[in-house]
C-alpha cells in the first residue's frame, strides 16, 4: 500500500471517469442555472468550494465496477453532489465557519439567511432532477438518505456540550450525517448498472464504512490539520463544543483531578483553552486511537469489495479507502 501515489489519486480517478464526471458537472450546472442574477452570483461562488466531488466519483466508480455507466448514473451523480453541497452550505452556518476551499463561505460573504435559503434551493433542485428518471426508486432512496443526514445533524446539534457522549453515540451521528450519502451513492451506482442486489448491498456497506473512515479523518484534521492545506476553518468542532472521537477518547482515559480541568477547558471553547487541549491530546493516545479506528473502518470498506471482479474501477475504490485515512485535506 505504501508505494502508491495516494496524493495523486483524485486526479487519476478524474482521468478514469473524466468524460462521465464532466457530464455530471454539466448536468449540475444546467439544473442550477438561474436567470436571477443574485442567485446566479451565489451559485458561481459556491462552485469554487465544492471540493473533491467524492460522492459522484463513488457513484460512477461503483457503476463502472459492476457494469457500464449510463445516463441515469450521470444524473444521479449531479443529484448527490447537490445534496452534499447543500449540507456544506448549511454546515457552515451551524459552525459559523468563514472559509471553505480557500474562499469565503456563503454566510461569511453574504449572511446566514442567504446560506439557509440557498441550501434549500440546492435540496429542491436535487429532488427535481432525481424525479426526471424513469422510476421513483432513486428519488425515494435519496429522500430517505437526506432525512437520515438531517437526523444526524440534528442529533449532533442536540449533543453539543455533552461531555459524556459515548463513542457508539458519536459513530451513530457520523453514520447518519456523513456515511449515509456515501452509502446511497455506491448503492445507486451498482443498482443502475443492473448489478445483482447482493453486490449492490455490499457496495452500499463499502460506502457506509468508507464514509465513517472519512469523517473520523476529517475530525482529526479539524484538530491537527493546517488551514493552508485544508483550505477551511479549523477548530470549529471544539468552538461549537462538538465532541469528536479524539476528545471522547481523551476524556475516557483521563482520571481525576485532571479530568475536571479537561472538562473546564472543553466548556470554555476559546483559543487559549484549545491550545491547552491540543497539548493534552499530544500527550495521550487519543490521536493514535482515532487514527486506528479510521483505519479499521477503511479495512472494513475494502472487505466489502471482495464481491467485485478485478478492474481498474475496483482498484480505485480500494485506493480511496487508503486516501481517506492518509490525506491532509
Mark where each language-model region is:
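All-alpha prenyltransferase/terpene-synthase fold signal
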Residues: 1-329
Amino acid at each position: 500500500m505504501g508505494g502508491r501515489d495516494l496524493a495523486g489519486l483524485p486526479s487519476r480517478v478524474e482521468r478514469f471517469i473524466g468524460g462521465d464526471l464532466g457530464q455530471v458537472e454539466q448536468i449540475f450546472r444546467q439544473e442550477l442555472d438561474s436567470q436571477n442574477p443574485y442567485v446566479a452570483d451565489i451559485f458561481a461562488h459556491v462552485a469554487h468550494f465544492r471540493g473533491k466531488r467524492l460522492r459522484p466519483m463513488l457513484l460512477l466508480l461503483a457503476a463502472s465496477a459492476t457494469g457500464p455507466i449510463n445516463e441515469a448514473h450521470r444524473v444521479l451523480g449531479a443529484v448527490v453532489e447537490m445534496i452534499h453541497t447543500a449540507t456544506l452550505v448549511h454546515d457552515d452556518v451551524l459552525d459559523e465557519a468563514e472559509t471553505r476551499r480557500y474562499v469565503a463561505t456563503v454566510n461569511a460573504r453574504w449572511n446566514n439567511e442567504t446560506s439557509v435559503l440557498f441550501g434549500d434551493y440546492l435540496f429542491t433542485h436535487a429532488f427535481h432532477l432525481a424525479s426526471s428518471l424513469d422510476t421513483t426508486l432513486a428519488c425515494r432512496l435519496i429522500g430517505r438518505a437526506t432525512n437520515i443526514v438531517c437526523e444526524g445533524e440534528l442529533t449532533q446539534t442536540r449533543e453539543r456540550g455533552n461531555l459524556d457522549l459515548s463513542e457508539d453515540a458519536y459513530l451513530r451521528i457520523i453514520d447518519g450525517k456523513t456515511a449515509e450519502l456515501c452509502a446511497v451513492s455506491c448503492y445507486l451506482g451498482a443498482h443502475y448498472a443492473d448489478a445483482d442486489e447482493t453486490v449492490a448491498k455490499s457496495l452500499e456497506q463499502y460506502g457506509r464504512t468508507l464514509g465513517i473512515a472519512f469523517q473520523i479523518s476529517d475530525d482529526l484534521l479539524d484538530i491537527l490539520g493546517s488551514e493552508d492545506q485544508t483550505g477551511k476553518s479549523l477548530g470549529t468542532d471544539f468552538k461549537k463544543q462538538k465532541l469528536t472521537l479524539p476528545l471522547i477518547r481523551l476524556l475516557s482515559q483521563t482520571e481525576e483531578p485532571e479530568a475536571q480541568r479537561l472538562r473546564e477547558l472543553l466548556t470554555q471553547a476559546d483559543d487559549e483553552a484549545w491550545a491547552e487541549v491540543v497539548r493534552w491530546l499530544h500527550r495521550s493516545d487519543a490521536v493514535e486511537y482515532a487514527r486506528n479506528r479510521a483505519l479499521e473502518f477503511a479495512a472494513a470498506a475494502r472487505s466489502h469489495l471482495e464481491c467485485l471482479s478485478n478492474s481498474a474501477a475496483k482498484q480505485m475504490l480500494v485506493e480511496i479507502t487508503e486516501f481517506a485515512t492518509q490525506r491532509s485535506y
